[in-house]
Amino acid sequence: MEFILDTADLEAVKQLDELLTIDGVTTNPAIITRSGKQPEEVIKEFVEYLLPEQKFFVQVVSTDYEQMLEEARYICGLRPENTYVKIPVTRNGYKAIKQLKSEGFGVLATAIYSADEAFLAAMNGADYLAPYVNRMCNYGDGIGQVFDLMQMLETHGLNSKILAASFKNTEQVHALIAAGIDAVTLPPDIVYTMMGHPGTKIAVEEFSAAWREAYGRDTLLNRSGF
């Protein structure tokens, strides 16, 4: 499974990259605008920072077919390996996905609100499909829709990977990971919640207190004895 960060905050990525195995970064127009930086600066920072094996996902902004292709080619040209252009599943988007795949570009179909939308993008050859899990829940059973999509892809032998996005809580993430999802992309706050169970802190504090009481120090080795 691929574990990806959904953010344009490079410092947040660096911090989590030291703690966990991070497979890449996703961005979108809204996330980039919240960075307070120019888009060219944000993209350049990540192109320079990410390791070759880490994936980078950047979304087109234009809704015009020809301009979508132009933006997609520009994005992939900045970092030819392991860069994927994100294309919303509009009518022009489906057309662009089909064309870009014929040119050999990596494509993630995004802004997906139903299993049917995702399935059609998979038929066009999209490498990744990004269902907006929590937003789908606002219209019905979002988790169930993703389960349906997993079955649809398997039944018809399609190789697109599901990169689940738009999570509100860790319960949604847990449900999809447990079901065998291909990939998730998460904002840093959700990631920290996943690793921050209060019971862990209590247990560590109890271990430390017992050790200090018995040995009068906070380390395994008694350095003064060397």
PLM features per residue range, with description:
Residues 28, 85, 121, 176, ...:
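Conserved, mostly hydrophobic/aromatic
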Residues 20-24, 79-81, 99-108, 123-130, ...:
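Glycine-enriched alpha-helix->loop->beta-strand junction motifs that scaffold or abut catalytic
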Residues 2-14, 19-22, 26-99, 133:
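Active-site beta->alpha loop and helix N-cap motifs at the rims of alpha/beta catalytic domains
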Residues 29-32, 111, 128-139, 180-200:
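Glycine-rich phosphate-binding active-site loops on the catalytic face of alpha/beta enzymes
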Residues 34-45, 64-70, 87-102, 114-122, ...:
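Active-site-adjacent beta->alpha loops and helix N-cap segments on the catalytic face
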Residues 11-19, 67-71, 75, 96, ...:
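Catalytic cores of alpha/beta
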Residues 153-226:
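C-terminal alpha-helical cap/extension of soluble enzyme domains
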Residues 40, 44-56, 78, 94-106, ...:
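Alpha-helix-loop-beta-strand connector modules within alpha/beta enzyme cores
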